[in-house]
Amino acid sequence: MDPIKHISLPVLVLFLLLSVSAGQPGTPDQRHDPYAYSGSLSPAMAVVVVVVIAALFFMGFFTVYIRHCTGAVDGSVTPAGGARRRVTNATVARGLDAETIETFPTFVYSEVKTQKIGKGALECAICLNEFEDDETLRLLPKCDHVFHPHCIGAWLQGHVTCPVCRTNLAEQTPEPEVVVETDLEAQQQSAVPVPVVELPRVKFPRSHTTGHSVVLPGESTDRFTLRVPEELRKKIMANWKLNRSNSVFVLPRGGSSRSGKQVDRSRAKSDRWLFRKTPSFLWRNRDDGSIRLGGTGSVRGNSVTSPSGDSVRADRWAFLRNPSFLWRNTTPVPSPRVEVNNKDGEGTSSVQHIGTVGSTSGSLRLPV
């Protein structure tokens, strides 16, 4: 029925009742009695009552209409429930992390092509393409199914099961425990292990309309399965673990840790700095014999004799007074000219005084 008819009918009835009550005159007793109740209603009051009733009626009508249009007539679905359902679905759709995916071994197809069991070609169950000899395969150790690394990587980001056999790849296979029963009398005897009987898991068939598997029930999965001898399988797993361990540790290179360059030890003695600082001269001598430095001091054997008469070891630094300048000796022989005179089996050497840089026998150059 038309909603306007529902609205007009009560309003007309209300107006009729108001007009009838207003047209009835009061009794004489009620007009003279000051406390008597007057049943008359003014027209303004009647209009106010009608407007209020009509407003309430329209509010209820539009409320029902809006709820009907939004599809929430029964009010059973709430926003909180919808948000909770979306969070639950997102949690269920979460797959394996990248570290777990990288633990599955990879190898080149040509390494196992001639040794695999079976004559048929291997295919990737996700892209349904045959493997080429130079392509890399990723093996799932729990079910021996092989895929392209990028194909199975994209699948495992949203799933935790194998796309062929639905094996849960996130579960860790527990090792069977051995229970040993002993008592006081059997402590000296060998323990008897009690075998643990494990019941096989029974999986009920599921509907294939949810997209949890890429292989139809009853379809042959031999072309997706890599069957190789057990020795070759162990070798593949061992090589994969070795490659992963080598990729983590890097051996340091040999050589000097300071400059990274090899040092020519033959020129280490002669190619050094000679420092002259006013009022002293600094020089280190590691040779044997007696060396006289311009009359300022001498070295005999392994000791240095200064003008004051003090002696120090020749392999230490000697400070002598001389003019100050700095040069570097680049020749493989000592820069001062040394004269050797053997007297009584004692080696004596004298060094001419170095007045200028050009007076040395070796090539001396000032540092830039």
Swiss-Prot record:
Knockout consequences: Hypersensitivity to C/N conditions during post-germinative growth.
Keywords attached to this entry: Membrane, Metal-binding, Phosphoprotein, Plant defense, Signal, Transferase, Transmembrane, Transmembrane helix, Ubl conjugation pathway, Zinc, Zinc-finger
Entry's EC annotation: 2.3.2.27
Swiss-Prot/TrEMBL domain comment: The RING-type zinc finger domain mediates binding to an E2 ubiquitin-conjugating enzyme.
Keyword flag NAD: no
InterPro entries hit by this protein: RING-H2_zinc_finger (IPR053238), Znf_RING (IPR001841), Znf_RING/FYVE/PHD (IPR013083)
Signals that turn on the gene: Up-regulated by chitin. Down-regulated by abscisic acid (ABA).
GO terms classed as biological process: cellular response to hypoxia; cellular response to nitrogen levels; defense response to bacterium; defense response to other organism; protein ubiquitination; response to abscisic acid
GO cellular component, one term: membrane
One Gene Ontology MF term: zinc ion binding
Protein name: E3 ubiquitin-protein ligase ATL31
